[in-house]
Amino acid sequence: MLGFAKKFFGSSNERKVKAMSARVAQINALEPEYAALSDEALKAKTEEFKARLAKGEPLDSLLVEAFAVVREAGKRVLGMRHFDVQMVGGMVLHGGGISEMRTGEGKTLVATLPTYLNALEGKGVHVITVNDYLAKRDAEWMGQIHNFLGLSYGVIVNGLSQGERQRAYRSDITYGTNNEFGFDYLRDNLVYSVEEMVQRGHHYVIVDEVDSILIDEARTPLIISGPTEDRSEFYKTIDVLVKDLIKDKTNFDHDEKQKQVILTEEGQERIEEILMAGGHLAEDTAGLYDAANISIVHHVNQALRANVLYTFDKDYIVKDDEVILIDEFTGRMMTGRRLSEGLHQAIEAKEGVSVQPENQTLASVTIQNYFRLYKKLAGMTGTAATEAQEFDDIYKMGVSEIPTNRPVLRIDDDDEVYRTEREKNDSILKQITDCHARGQPILVGTVSIEKSEELSRLLATYAWEWEGKKHTGIPHQVLNARFHEQEAGIVADAGVPGAVTIATNMAGRGTDIQLGGNMDMRLANWRQQQKGLGITPTHEDELAQRAELEIEIGAAKARALAAGGLFVLGTERHESRRIDNQLRGRTGRQGDPGRSKFFLSCEDDLLRIFAGERLDAIMRTFGVQEGEAITHKWLNNAIATAQKRVEQRNYEIRKNLLKYDDVVNDQRKAVFEQRQEFMEATDLSDIITEMRHDVIDDFIARYMPPKAYAEQWDIEGLDERVQAILGLTLPLKEWAAEEGFGDEEMRERLNKAADEYAAQREAIITPEQMRSVEKNFLLQMIDLQWREHLMHLDHLRNVIGLRGYGQRDPLNEYKTEAFSLFEKLLGDLRTNTTRWLMTVEIAYAEPEPLHTPEGLVEVHLDPLSGENVATAGALPEGLSPQQREALPVSVLPEGWEYTARNGACPCGSGKKFKHCHGALV
């Protein structure tokens, strides 16, 4: 019935696209008129549109004219005309949806339409790409259109100064990566003055490769952290013990499907014996699982995970004495990202490299919650349909499949499945040889660096024969995390006849594989060669070189087309169908022919874990011989079903994690907004007074509860708190003994006495100086309390799952306890602020401006772990005289400032100085 209805009425996607065709016709109708305009008249349209917006005209009413202006500018500046289907893609983006456009259909050019239209409002438009190279390329390329039309553009890449970032964000359109935008948001909430902030709000954003960023990285929080104490030697000790333990596989259980590993009962007993014999357990404890040894249990578990779950050259590589994570989805190195909870340190100990200190979180946000800050969110990709439900559920974004400008001529062959890895590799080598010899370019996709380099070794020594001639080795290029610097160049040449390119998953995404070669990259290489020879090419030289290259590339393209176009060969199926579709989508661009095929074996991870035994039994039943493959539609369907199950499981994990992070996100927004108000204010005295009165209200509620009799009051306890927090010695007992005296009278007298004392303290210095003291102190205090709160939430999140064993919903438990912790944060902020401002000795010296702490670590965690990181900034060993003089108030008793940061705090709290009073300075 559904198919019958679709036949007559079309799919919902077709109806959406058709509905936009009327506006496309209107845009086309304006083309002759705008083509006749001079450059100045066309540029003047921008100011005309802004003036109409200022008069109250809605933005949507400008869409037809604005899109027509951008199309004309594209023709004049870049020699590129937006196709009708690109106009449809631009409308979807303007509406806050996702445009699914196939590779080669010009997503980068499409983005110029909605960016121009939305930038007219003057609130800033952000365009997100997956790496710095693409951000710079797109900004310099498409920025020419925006500049021509009178709009400014900027680009945010790693290594920019604060001033450069501010200028880029103040541009009409800003390009950059999701990491850079996210970290700038977090840094803006660590600074101490509005002038230091770089971003100016979150108005409209377009995310390129939206599936990669909003789905694949959805479990990867952006974290700014600082180092804690050094436990590197202990990590090494535990690693040695665990390496010995796992030699006997009865000591642990490894669940590959869930990616988990735990000690068996035998393993627990064995490691306990070893630790006890080595004197590693706390004294006078019953065993490993005694509360005093819980941190040791944590170290053992992380060492176990590092040695069993994480594989060298697949999950990470070692480079320059560092463990660098590998992105499972792209195969790229994730430089700067570190796994949390000591797991990264455990891997460092495993590999024998320097063990870096653990980190404590100063600020964090998930990719999901960062992008949900924007009033309007849009995205582009070649593969989003398989995740349409998730985009709708989490981001409220619809996916629209945009028709191709030309028909797709790609042929997708059925998978070939072999019994063993060796048989599969033999067939892959034969297929590569055939393509190379016939002049057909081939892109080979692998799932890991290890697999790409193994295949490279096989190709280097492969003996083959073609037309009676014998050869050894096949020339090829390898594109993985080790060679990411050459990424764009390798991908650009992947379409020349006979080229063999091995790439991990979707490395090189964002750069088209053009049959015959990439003109822009060839020209860039030529310019570089000329520069090396000391020659500065003239415009005429460039035109002549371009003409020469057009002939050369045209001839090469004809040979590649005659051989069948680009052949895409997948060496394994990914857990996600979308990643497989991304690989397939590299061929068949702009109506070119192409072919794709996956070569699989029963030993591949996906098939082995989810369908290995059944598949092997079927192959035996059918009598499949050595080197033979089975190819059938039902087999493709069975693999797709296994992938759907894994996708659904991963989606549930992401959705569940988001529910937990939403709890933190609400609190984060509240704290960041409050902090922003503090920073922008010039006078916080009313807030300080309100805090003081709230503290007194808390005292009254605790020590003189409502409806309690006078003999039930705890006046002694109240007196202690008043002296400790307010610095006041008052005759509370005499007051309480007065006839008719109650809680309201106590509140009034305490408020009056505290206000008078605060006024006396303020008289020691000028009102302006006091406002400066209050503001600087309050900002530092809110940061300190928020950091401690994040640490408590981390600990809560790590143990809350155990509540499920007690038949209680862990999420509801987490919400309840997180709210209680947040209330405690607010209470502590009021109390600590009041105590310090009422009790410290005021000795004012003109303070240096407060700046964001230096030496912070920016971390974006591995998508597979989805774990949180622990956090905090390092303080120096005591404070220098200059630092002491710069303190707005003497917040420490005399001599305490010389305490070593890792030493015990002199206050007797039992905490380290850096985690107690030292954190205040």
Swiss-Prot record:
What positions does the entry give for ATP binding?
Answer: Q86, G104, E105, G106, K107, T108, D512
- Which keywords does this Swiss-Prot/TrEMBL entry list? ATP-binding, Cell inner membrane, Cell membrane, Cytoplasm, Membrane, Metal-binding, Nucleotide-binding, Protein transport, Translocase, Translocation, Transport, Zinc
Report the EC code(s) recorded for this entry: 7.4.2.8
Amino acids binding Zn(2+): C905, C907, C916, H917
Localization annotation: Cell inner membrane; Cytoplasm
Q: Name one GO cellular component term.
A: plasma membrane
Instruction: Assign the protein's first listed, main location to one coarse class.
Output: membrane
Give the source's domain of life in one word.
Bacteria
Q: How does it sit in the membrane?
A: Peripheral membrane protein
Question: What are the GO MF terms of this UniProt record?
Answer: ATP binding; metal ion binding; protein-exporting ATPase activity
**InterPro entries from the entry?**
Helicase_ATP-bd, P-loop_NTPase, SEC_C_motif, SecA, SecA_CS, SecA_DEAD, SecA_motor_DEAD, SecA_preprotein_X-link_dom
Q: What class of enzyme is it?
A: translocase
Reactions the enzyme catalyzes: ATP + H2O + cellular proteinSide 1 = ADP + phosphate + cellular proteinSide 2
Question: How does the cofactor attach, per the note?
Answer: May bind 1 zinc ion per subunit.
Biological process terms from the Gene Ontology for this record are: intracellular protein transmembrane transport; protein import; protein targeting; protein transport by the Sec complex
Q: Name the SMART domains on file.
A: SecA_DEAD, SecA_PP_bind
Cofactor(s) recorded for this entry are: Zn(2+)
Family as reported in the entry's similarity comment = Belongs to the SecA family.
Q: What is the recorded function of this protein according to its Swiss-Prot or TrEMBL entry?
A: Part of the Sec protein translocase complex. Interacts with the SecYEG preprotein conducting channel. Has a central role in coupling the hydrolysis of ATP to the transfer of proteins into and across the cell membrane, serving both as a receptor for the preprotein-SecB complex and as an ATP-driven molecular motor driving the stepwise translocation of polypeptide chains across the membrane.
The record's subunit annotation is: Monomer and homodimer. Part of the essential Sec protein translocation apparatus which comprises SecA, SecYEG and auxiliary proteins SecDF-YajC and YidC.
Protein name as annotated: Protein translocase subunit SecA
